[in-house]
Amino acid sequence: MELNETDNKILKNLLEDARFSSRQIAKNVGVSVGTVLSRIKKMEDAGLIKGYSAILNHEKLGYELTVVTEITVSKGRLVEVEKEIAKNPNVCGVYDVTGLTDAVIIAKFKSREDLGRFTKQLLALPYIERTNTHVVLTTVKENFRLL
């Protein structure tokens, strides 16, 4: 879907605060409420807007550890392994990557014990040859609201 300037402005408003009313977005963008509603509907139908949610402070929820885990998978079973890993509620992202490893996992944990259990579960999965886990010391930026 091609986005024009109005679409981008609407999206920026939604990214700023998804609770903005259509009337508020229309006022901010300088278009009618009908335009805002129809553009949002088109972007939802096209799959550009996948949903609306709150942005949580994970540390305040007790998730003290963020990890980046590289995995190497054998026998061409990468997609199967990734789908299984993605089911874990602590996993925030699973990515195919280039380089020495096959995939990267971003996950958050409340304790070292939880991280240890997760690592053991990974190594118990068929076709995982090895893992390499990096514990994040400081999060400088974590924001997936791109536009």
What do the PLM-derived regions correspond to, one by one?
Residues 1-147:
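A compositional/biophysical signature of low hydrophobicity enriched in polar/charged and small residues
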